[in-house]
């Protein structure tokens, strides 16, 4: 669809945004059982998103897995919030049109969003001229920023200065396009909102990473189709 001549004219090849969104798995917490087949109090380890306490039993992705969908992993968005079995859907948006030009679905991990972003942007970065990638502060990590620069991608990433030093310095924030990238990148939330509400992907009805990945890509394409009539109508006559 994006390769069609009229659609291709809507796209720039220089400015993009990336983000991720949680997709709840089609599996209940009752299916999240010890991998060794035993019950009991497992200590669990990892960050705040890796473990949760269920009626005195400690469960984590290291010690437990869903018997309904082994690809789904336990995730808690923040302290005091309910832990759920989830995947992470990732989208790459072209900034001028707001169309989604690539997607990924991955298991939950602390590095999943940044790895998916690198995977998606690499195909667009294979050119002499630098391109830009806008992202929220969750992507502000030194290794990710350095990898983008190696690919000749300008990291228009929001600065995260809470309890640490940001990897984004003045040479980036002073760039004329940085503020524009930070403003436009938020439009990807419109796509995620449509995918999760209108297309029903807030909680998938499929099991297995490959199937959920396919469904996410399909609904992103549907979002683009909904957007296209307006975009094509705004296109200046040839």
What would you call each of these model-derived segments?
Residues 24, 29-31, 97, 154, ...:
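Short loop/turn segments at secondary-structure transitions that flank enzyme active sites
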Residues 1-147, 223:
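Polybasic low-complexity intrinsically disordered regions
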Residues 198, 202, 229-238:
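A short, flexible helix-boundary coil/loop motif
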Residues 93, 188-189, 195, 223-226:
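Residue-level micro-sites within transmembrane alpha helices that shape
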Residues 2, 33, 51-55, 169, ...:
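Generic detector of well-ordered alpha-helical segments enriched in charged/polar residues
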Residues 39-41, 46, 137-210, 214-217:
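Helix-centered, glycine/charged polyanion-binding patches within enzymatic domains
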Residues 218, 222-225, 231:
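Aspartic protease catalytic domain
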